[in-house]
Amino acid sequence: MATQIDASSEAAAATAAAQHTPMMQQYLRIKSEHPDTLVFYRMGDFYELFFEDAEKAARLLDLTLTQRGASAGTPIKMAGVPHHAVEQYLAKLVKFGESAAICEQIGDPATSKGPVERKVVRVVTPGTLTDAALLSDKSDVFLLALCVGHNKRGVASNIGLAWLNLASGALRLAELAPDQLGAALERIRPAEILAADGTIESVPAGMGAITRVPAWHFDIASGTQRLCDQLEVASLDGFGAQALTSANGAAGALLIYAAATQGQQLRHVRSLKVENESEYIGLDPSTRRNLELTETLRGTESPTLYSLLDTCCTAMGSRLLRHWLHHPPRASVAAQARHQAIGALLDAPPNAGLDSLRSALRQIADVERITGRLALLSARPRDLSSLRDTFAALPALRERVAEIASNAAALGRLEAALEPPPGCLDLLTRAIAAEPAAMVRDGGVIARGYDAELDELRDISENCGQFLIDLETRERARTGISNLRVEYNKVHGFYIEVTRGQTDKVPDDYRRRQTLKNAERYITPELKTFEDKALSAQERALARERALYDGVLQALLPHIEGCQRVASGLAELDLLAAFAERARTLDWVAPEFTDEIGIEIDQGRHPVVEAQVEQFIANDCALNPERKLLLITGPNMGGKSTFMRQTALIALMAYVGSYVPAKAARFGPIDRIFTRIGAADDLAGGRSTFMVEMTEAAAILNDATPHSLVLMDEIGRGTSTFDGLALAWAIARHLLSHNRCYTLFATHYFELTQLPVEFPQAANVHLSAVEHGHGIVFLHAVEEGPANQSYGLQVAQLAGVPAPVIRAARKHLAHLEQQSAAQATPQLDLFAAPPVVDEPECNEPPAATPHPALERLLELDPDDLKPRDALDLLYELHTLARSGPADAQR
């Protein structure tokens, strides 16, 4: 029965297909293989999109939607783009998270019966970009696969991640707990995520385009074997990945998908890196955001730490900088090696020094991405010429590095990495023209002298006229016919024309081609051979050039790993040179590391803020086992957040391997950096500002260790005063007694400044400011002890709060202070040392009621009184003063 149904379905499908034109049958077959992808169908000089694809493309790309004819009774909606401009349209689609299947003509229109044969040669998706026109120079694009592992009860126990930078071939794996997924995706920032239907809900919203792939692609055993096949190894033990489970399953799905989009093997994926949380200083999403490492809180690219540090001369160096900032190593060994290299670069002699080195680096091409395209056989002619010119410049660059490398082992390693693969430069020099055309189809790509046949075809095409003149001269001399002519027309091609009176002198090798009234036209074997070549010379030259170019690409494939080694060395050298330039220009110093717990910064400066202002006030920061928590008080805008952030940034820069903005700095081990700074709600997640604040605080309290650096800014401010104060006090105590981490704790709760009485490991510091008239001057200097005022009204005045509001606030503040002073049990003043209050005796009379004249006076705003009103008020106050509180109450 099932067989009958299948046969009926196939017959119905065949009948439906037969109603379409042959070309539309071909298109619909290809479209059925890529149902969720926009199909760019090559027709002559255009890529056409049909039906629903055309409607979507017209909307997204602002194309004209047309309708031409019908197929199977359905109007054919069309939209097209010129083939030479397709990359710019693909770039727009990728930004919208769309994918496109590029369908090319692979058959010969002259010999095809019916539609020209076509097939999809590549699929462009958000995570599989390799073309230079589709990529940002200074950031990587990652394709990530996610596989959820389950325990025996069917509960998610771990998550395996595999992510690939297809443009470079860098493959990484990780396995983590389910609650760590959001932080991992925030760090990796994949452009596209591959997941099976049952795991898509695990992916947090807004983390990249999600592509569904079959669940069987994530099979762990198959994934492990596929990784071994890809890396050409028998076991993954050498990469530390053999014992992984879900990560290997994710890698298998990723490799299947990536190879399918490219339509070929991934020859440049030759190694992998297993990332372990213990390798790097932990930076959660909140910390990355608050420290503005690569993006400001407003979502812009600058001013950030990345934009300040990125003076790299190559795109490779800029991308490596971004990676280093998000992956600071915990072990200080790597940072110390980088500091040593920076010192050697700064101390180098002028002829081989920093400026000379950076000048040479500016001539270097993006070897990393060119190598990726080379491995995928999609490198263009100018990619190869750029690679050739870079390899030609490497010997001089290596000499400069070698002169400096004796003082830094890291530079010695890089100098060795800069040796081009043997034979690669020679091949590129011989094969590729000095200034090749942008595309192979335009010709002029292969250098003269590389191939004799191509040179001859070019000569024929370019020097056809000269050949005919030379042949005519030779034939006149050979035959003695002075008026012999060699000519050409489109009907008969090339011929030798002899007048009737001279035909008796025609040699035996002349063959008659055409008889005219007064002349005979002949062809010779030499001319026939030339004709065959000349008439197709240009076409044949382009075909020969294409074949030779493909041969060059194939010949370069064995050099992929060598090119990757060179690219890695160039990127690191460029970044170290950029660090050295920043250190020299901005007066930064090499930090020191110690195994003892502590952070000591002498005259530290916020690197980004300092670059934005004319003068920056440097401050010290000292944290050690006897001084683990600094309670920071002071006015708003006084610099509390800047001081905290600069401490974290200086520590991060030190471990990344950069010099730091300070007079001196010394760091003990740091395993994580936490921040609880700023106020923002999560409307999409249904969380209030206070809930976000408490969630971040909970993560810190649960995860911080004695080696963690914690920044807490005004914790507890999102609720009532007493709730907030109680929470802030309890959190600070917990950080001191349980976490015992390095902590910078900024607060406006002055009651917290009593914490050092109970915990000697806490200390008070404040950001100084002085009043000037009704205004305030921020000194931005960190001084010992608590602040004595909040300066809230002065800051509000600076912010432009209207004067009547400021006056009303000042009156109400005086009223509140008066009430507080009159209370039997006074509340602690916000920014004054707590008074010593004697216990009242039992027979002590109650506190006096404030005098009505004083209360009335406090209600006044003298600036709003007219002369007559002031006089009336004076009489009123006189009466109140004489009557007293008791009379006023009556």
UniProtKB/Swiss-Prot annotation:
Signal peptide, first to last residue: none
One Pfam family matching this protein: MutS_IV
Entry GO CC: cytosol
Domain of life from the UniProt record: Bacteria
Presence of keyword Chaperone: no
GO annotation (BP), single: mismatch repair
UniProt cross-references to CDD domains, sorted A to Z: ABC_MutS1 (cd03284)
Keyword terms of this UniProt record: ATP-binding, DNA damage, DNA repair, DNA-binding, Nucleotide-binding
Binding annotation for ATP: 634-641
Single GO MF annotation: damaged DNA binding
SUPFAM superfamilies for the chain: DNA repair protein MutS, domain I (SSF55271), DNA repair protein MutS, domain II (SSF53150), DNA repair protein MutS, domain III (SSF48334), P-loop containing nucleoside triphosphate hydrolases (SSF52540)
HAMAP family listed in its UniProt record: MutS
Task of the protein: This protein is involved in the repair of mismatches in DNA. It is possible that it carries out the mismatch recognition step. This protein has a weak ATPase activity.
Family recorded in the similarity comment: Belongs to the DNA mismatch repair MutS family.
Identification of the protein by name: DNA mismatch repair protein MutS
Lineage start: Bacteria, Pseudomonadati, Pseudomonadota, Betaproteobacteria, Burkholderiales
